[in-house]
Amino acid sequence: MVVKIGILKCGNIGMSPIIDLCLDERADRNDIDVRVLGSGAKMNPDQVEEVSKKMVEEKPDFIVYIGPNPAAPGPKKAREILAASGIPSVIIGDAPGIKDKDAMAEQGLGYVLIKCDPMIGARRQFLDPVEMAMFNADVIRVLAGTGALRVVQNAIDEMVFAVEEGKEISLPKIVITEQKAVDAMDFANPYAKAKAMAAFVMAEKTADIDVKGCFMTKEMEKYIPIVASAHETIRYAAKMVDEARELEKATDAVSRKPHAGDGKILNKCKLMEKPE
């Protein structure tokens, strides 16, 4: 059977551009069909309501909503619509959503909250399209290299497998910490694991710095260097995960878990071997 997945992208976090791609990295899975709707960079209640209702009309087997701060007004509107739809739904968000995780569970929604997916330094005097793209590229590298991406991908794949097997979907309820992330990555070298953990914590700190620069500091001459320092922090976090991967490469021990054509998750470590 083919499982129909609905993905709602409202606003953007680092995981947003790759949430659909990580399920079908070579575009050759024959067991899923993905539909993506979104409201662009904005996530105001009216825009989120419009695309959420359109997604419900598509009647997918389950819905994945992804965007910043699931506790904000726009995402809360999506949560209301999805909870009332009767379609199994999971909310993927960043650390600010942790304070609402119990409320999401009470609504009958699953959640995957990523602590290393930081907010951007959204000050006009600093952030232009180039800076935005470079920041998100660094965040994606951290998500991938620490194992956070793999936790998200596995959670969604488990939902796919449940539908294929005719079972009731067990909605994920996950807060991704540095330990959860690196455990999913199957590091062989303990120094590589340590570097990935350090990168994860640096990404968490990036969020704290950007919150300070965007919301807690009013003087321009103060907040510009604050948000700039946050972006420098995530840049070095991305370099740290590169170093971790290079350590794994050096001993031919990079964990790779590609999808088979039927969606099964395969496994390999040595570069020249076939995944099984």
From Swiss-Prot:
The gene is mtd. Belongs to the MTD family. It comes from the Archaea. The keyword Oxidoreductase applies. Its EC number is 1.5.98.1. Pathway: One-carbon metabolism; methanogenesis from CO(2); 5,10-methylene-5,6,7,8-tetrahydromethanopterin from 5,10-methenyl-5,6,7,8-tetrahydromethanopterin (coenzyme F420 route): step 1/1. NCBIfam families: PRK00994.1 (NF002162). One of its GO terms (biological process) is methanogenesis, from carbon dioxide. This is F420-dependent methylenetetrahydromethanopterin dehydrogenase. InterPro entries: MTD, MTD_sf. The keyword DNA-binding does not apply. Catalyzes the reversible reduction of methenyl-H(4)MPT(+) to methylene-H(4)MPT. It catalyses: 5,10-methylenetetrahydromethanopterin + oxidized coenzyme F420-(gamma-L-Glu)(n) + 2 H(+) = 5,10-methenyl-5,6,7,8-tetrahydromethanopterin + reduced coenzyme F420-(gamma-L-Glu)(n). Keywords: Methanogenesis, One-carbon metabolism, Oxidoreductase. One of its GO terms (molecular function) is ferredoxin hydrogenase activity.
